[in-house]
Swiss-Prot record:
Tree of life domain: Eukaryota
A Gene Ontology cellular-component term: extracellular region
Coiled-coil positions: none
Protein's cellular compartments: Secreted
Further information: The primary structure of this cryptide Pep-3 is identical to that of cryptide Pep-3 from other Tityus species (AC P69940, AC Q5G8A6, AC P0C2F3).
Alphabetic keyword roster: Secreted
Protein species of origin: Tityus obscurus (Amazonian scorpion)
Name the UniProt record assigns to this protein: Cryptide Pep-3
Function: Does not induce hemolytic activity, lactate dehydrogenase (LDH) release from mast cells, mast cell degranulation, and antimicrobial effects. In vivo, injection into mice causes moderate edema formation, but induces very weak or no change in nociceptive sensibility. It also reduces mice locomotion, suggesting an increase in anxiety, but causes no alteration in rearing (standing on hind limbs).
Tissues where this protein is expressed: Expressed by the venom gland.
Amino acid sequence: LIPNDQLRSI
């Protein structure tokens, strides 16, 4: 799965 860092693309 993708790390939360990827979701932190805000």
